[in-house]
Amino acid sequence: LALSEGYFSRRTWGDWLFALLVVAGAVFAFQRYHGAMDVYDKGILVAAVPTAIWLAWLWRPLRTLMLVVAALSLLAIVSYDGDLRRGDTVFWLKYFLSSQSAILWMSVLFFMSTIFYWIGMFARGPAAALEGLGSKLAWVAVTLALVGTMVRWYEGYQIGADIGHIPVSNLYEVFVLFSWITALFYLYYEAQYKTRAMGAFVMLVVSAAVGFLLWYTLVRDAQEIQPLIPALKSWWMKLHVPANFIGYGSF
């Protein structure tokens, strides 16, 4: 009990405000979409609330990340206004916030991050600060990867209720997942150990994944949202795939 009291007493007003926003967001999502949720979806939503709060309290940069991703995703959803054709006419959707645009920017920024990490690793003097720029670019890339994932989820349901699904069902979607999870784990360890020595090597792995993602997109038109095959229409997939790639990314 004393440990719990000490833990909660260390929370700032910003921590509690973030927790309130997460709870409010979950309540809104439940009220608006509960008709489309089965019991497993509702269970995952309930479990996601304390998990998101705990992670943001554990590592405060995640709080900023979650808020920015939520704000940009909501901006995209409001801008679509239920009509996917607006993705070709609304400037910020067409060039930044539609799922394909956000993921393309993610790809470019991960490549740039890798380049700056490598330059910074071998540079001396002021040029060594380029590793810091690589770190910042990686953060922006992670943000856009998450925005692209959230918006793709929305776009799927706008195409059709039987087509929409959590975007972790094919190689295109899971390589996006792998890229941002790997980068985010690295950024956590970078902050914890206060060194960017491994940045060039980790981001090289991420860039390789992004390279495959782009090749697969060009060869297979993998960016197109397709309905789930029957074998993947399971609540277990919603847990199994992210858990797998959390393991891959942390490894």
Language model feature labels by segment:
Residues 2-89, 98-225, 232, 239-251:
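Hydrophobic cores of alpha-helical transmembrane segments in multi-pass integral membrane proteins
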